[in-house]
């Protein structure tokens, strides 16, 4: 680790190309998401994929669980391309993937990657045959595969073998350690078998999903051991994290530790949406984790104080929220026009105690008056006080300052870039 508060250098691994996106191999950590629509409904699935891509998802996974879903995949891909949305699609297969990919070659071709779970491909000889069919299809169409092992669906024969070996050991492992070993063994043995069947090493991504919000330590231990034992690209995600703040905290607690150690090449935050909630929330949370850790930049960061007895007005909170929404909306335009604008930092502070100092540390900062203070708001640009705002249109004037800063500070991209 380079210092006590800087993430370690990234773990070296083999890069895997998924459509136009590189996972691992030194590439930036990839944000991905998954739809919750019925894939057989081409229109609604296309719309949600496009929404997730617009929010910043660089890969989008869709369920392929039936003949109807498999038949719809090529149409979804065509609809997205017609919209100018070229985000790679990942097919999520369980139980019957070997049948669907074989029966619907247009589905196999349209997907950029296949996700398979070795725990539910089948059992015994059937497992071997069906796993082979999946891998042979991937080889035929030159598609990468994520071999995703899940805590809740481990191959029972493999698990029984490991438990028997442990029982005969003079120094047996505890129950959790046995499960850790089973997850890792399943992933590595499946990857080795895939390579034997002809799937190149640079076409394999691994994941070991641990279930439940109280299992972060298990996830950290499993991925730490897996990272030491192989050089495959790794997908991180805490399955069944839950909804709301609990889901966000559970995912962040596990992902942040691993990312800090340099482990992880692509991430998904598996949030359960609130009723009527926005599916794209999981994309934004994943981006915020990476950006807060200094691993990637997606949108300008808006810092704001939490408020206290000095900040009796709620205006600074309203301004902070409106600016945060504004810059995220504007990034749709800015990222196409300006280089590096995602690195811009803003500060909206609520009183004189920390306001001026914190504002000076941001690219653009505003210090709003607290309780009993003169009703004026100094603005700092690149550490220097440039103007003092007052009146009823502070928010509008501050947005104009932000716009002007973007236009003058960041270089315009070439027209054909």
From Swiss-Prot:
[4Fe-4S] cluster binds at residues 305, 308, 351, 358. It comes from the Bacteria. One of its GO terms (molecular function) is 4-hydroxy-3-methylbut-2-enyl-diphosphate synthase activity (flavodoxin). GO terms for biological process: isopentenyl diphosphate biosynthetic process, methylerythritol 4-phosphate pathway; terpenoid biosynthetic process. The keyword Metal-binding applies. Binds 1 [4Fe-4S] cluster. It holds the Pfam family GcpE. Keywords: 4Fe-4S, Iron, Iron-sulfur, Isoprene biosynthesis, Metal-binding, Oxidoreductase. Pathway: Isoprenoid biosynthesis; isopentenyl diphosphate biosynthesis via DXP pathway; isopentenyl diphosphate from 1-deoxy-D-xylulose 5-phosphate: step 5/6. Gene3D superfamilies: Dihydropteroate synthase-like, Sulfite Reductase Hemoprotein, domain 1. InterPro entries: Dihydropteroate_synth-like_sf, IspG_bac, IspG_bac-typ, NO2/SO3_Rdtase_4Fe4S_sf. It catalyses: (2E)-4-hydroxy-3-methylbut-2-enyl diphosphate + oxidized [flavodoxin] + H2O + 2 H(+) = 2-C-methyl-D-erythritol 2,4-cyclic diphosphate + reduced [flavodoxin]. Its cofactor is [4Fe-4S] cluster. Its EC number is 1.17.7.3. Converts 2C-methyl-D-erythritol 2,4-cyclodiphosphate (ME-2,4cPP) into 1-hydroxy-2-methyl-2-(E)-butenyl 4-diphosphate. Belongs to the IspG family. This is 4-hydroxy-3-methylbut-2-en-1-yl diphosphate synthase (flavodoxin). It comes from Nitrosomonas europaea (strain ATCC 19718 / CIP 103999 / KCTC 2705 / NBRC 14298). The gene is ispG.
């Amino acid at each position: 680790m380079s210092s006590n508060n800087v993430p370690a250098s990234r773990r070296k691994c083999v890069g895997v190309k998924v459509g136009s996106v590189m996972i691992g191999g030194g590439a930036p950590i990839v944000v991905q998401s998954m739809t919750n629509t019925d894939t057989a409904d081409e229109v609604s699935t296309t719309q949600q994929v496009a929404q997730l891509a617009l929010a910043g998802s660089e890969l989008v996974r869709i369920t392929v669980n039936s003949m109807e879903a498999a038949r719809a995949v090529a149409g979804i891909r065509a609809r997205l391309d017609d919209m100018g949305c070229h985000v790679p699609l990942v097919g999520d297969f369980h139980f019957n993937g070997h049948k669907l990919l074989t029966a619907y070659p247009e589905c196999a071709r349209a997907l950029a990657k296949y996700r398979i779970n070795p725990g539910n491909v089948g059992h015994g000889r059937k497992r071997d045959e069906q796993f082979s069919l999946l891998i042979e299809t991937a080889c035929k169409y030159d598609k990468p595969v994520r071999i995703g092992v899940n805590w809740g669906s481990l191959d029972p024969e493999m698990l029984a073998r490991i438990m028997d070996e442990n029982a005969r050991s003079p120094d047996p492992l505890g129950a959790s350690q046995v499960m850790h070993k089973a997850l890792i063994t399943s992933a590595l043995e499946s990857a080795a078998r895939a390579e034997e069947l002809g799937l190149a090493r640079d076409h394999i991504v691994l994941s070991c999903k641990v279930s439940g919000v109280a299992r972060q330590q298990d996830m950290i231990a499993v991925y730490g051991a897996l990272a030491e034992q192989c050089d495959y690209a790794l997908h991180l995600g805490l399955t069944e994290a839950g909804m709301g703040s609990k889901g966000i905290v559970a995912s962040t607690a596990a992902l942040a530790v691993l990312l800090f150690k340099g482990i992880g090449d692509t991430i998904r935050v598996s949030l359960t949406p609130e009723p009527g909630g926005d599916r794209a929330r999981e994309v934004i949370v994943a981006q915020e984790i990476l950006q807060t850790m200094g691993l990637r930049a997606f949108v300008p960061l808006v810092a704001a104080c939490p408020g206290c007895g000095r900040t009796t007005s709620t205006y600074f909170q309203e301004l902070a929220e409106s600016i945060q929404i504004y810059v995220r909306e504007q990034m749709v335009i800015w990222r196409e026009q300006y280089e590096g604008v995602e690195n811009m930092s803003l500060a909206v502070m609520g009183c004189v105690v920390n306001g001026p100092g914190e504002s000076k540390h941001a690219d653009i900062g505003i210090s709003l008056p607290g309780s009993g203070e003169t009703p004026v708001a100094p603005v700092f640009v690149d550490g220097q006080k440039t103007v003092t705002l007052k009146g009823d249109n502070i928010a509008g004037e501050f947005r104009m300052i932000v716009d002007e800063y973007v236009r003058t500070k960041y270089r315009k991209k070439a027209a054909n870039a």
